[in-house]
Design a protein with these regions (language model features):
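Short, hydrophobic/aromatic-rich segments at coil-to-beta transitions
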Residues: 14-21
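Short, surface-exposed, charged amphipathic helix/loop patches that serve as local interaction elements
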Residues: 24-99
């Protein structure tokens, strides 16, 4: 499984801001990836894709920082990872009131 140092993590955080660690599988078969939060441009590009799996794949590829390539290339790992994609697409709640 992919591993990283504290220094690498600090460098990635400085470059990308908020990061997420995604672990797919268990034990010796587990694979890990580091993803950054998607930008407005990432979201716009992904939303243009009509297929929900392709949309998640676009976000995964665009937000990929480092990790085990099997997550992108092996369907079982890929499907496990994209099931968690919503967690990195955090949106602030807003209010609107009539004046």
């Amino acid at each position: 499984m992919f591993d990283y140092t504290v220094e690498e993590l600090a460098g990635w955080k400085a470059k990308h801001g908020q990061l997420y660690e995604v672990v797919v599988g268990e034990g010796e078969d587990a694979k890990k990836a580091i993803l950054r939060s998607p930008s407005r441009q990432d979201m716009s590009y992904a939303m243009a894709v009509k297929d929900p799996i392709k949309m998640s794949e676009t976000i995964l590829n665009n937000c990929w920082v480092a990790g085990d390539e099997e997550i992108k290339n092996d369907d079982q790992y890929f499907l496990g990872a994209i099931s968690q994609i919503d967690a990195i697409m955090q949106i602030k709640t807003a209010e609107i009131k009539k004046l």
